[in-house]
């Protein structure tokens, strides 16, 4: 997914679950006190699935605002039903912000539908650039 988004000119500004590449989360501050950097890293990262939906939605809102994100790609692996519960809440928030979302449910590893994913994301990016 990261390769597809990057090849299409997108930039990933947040990954909201605790699997995958942590490189997309906030970095540990290396120029400050090491303990302070670690504390900030764990306090300000995306909350795990153990917090309320409202808090998770607000964290997504803050990330979108802070990064000036123009779209959201929701990519859920097979059997990742917990994350799908927050979709209606995230969708409502994004509608208010006029931010488009594209969602992919039940995705396999490795990705078995890369062409469809690439086409859908490419279409979204084209629409963001004013294309039809």
Show where each model-derived region lies.
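Hydrophobic/aromatic beta-strand patches that form the interior of the parallel beta-sheet core
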Residues: 13, 72-73, 102
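Peripheral docking tails and interdomain loops at the edges
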Residues: 88-132
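Acidic beta-strand-to-loop metal/phosphate-binding motif
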Residues: 70-78
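Redox- and metal-dependent alpha/beta enzyme cores, enriched for Fe-S-associated oxidoreductases
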Residues: 1-52, 56-59
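Flexible loop/turn segments at secondary-structure boundaries
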Residues: 20-24, 79-83, 109-112
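A short, acidic, amphipathic alpha-helical segment used as a generic capping/interface helix at domain edges
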Residues: 51-68, 85-86
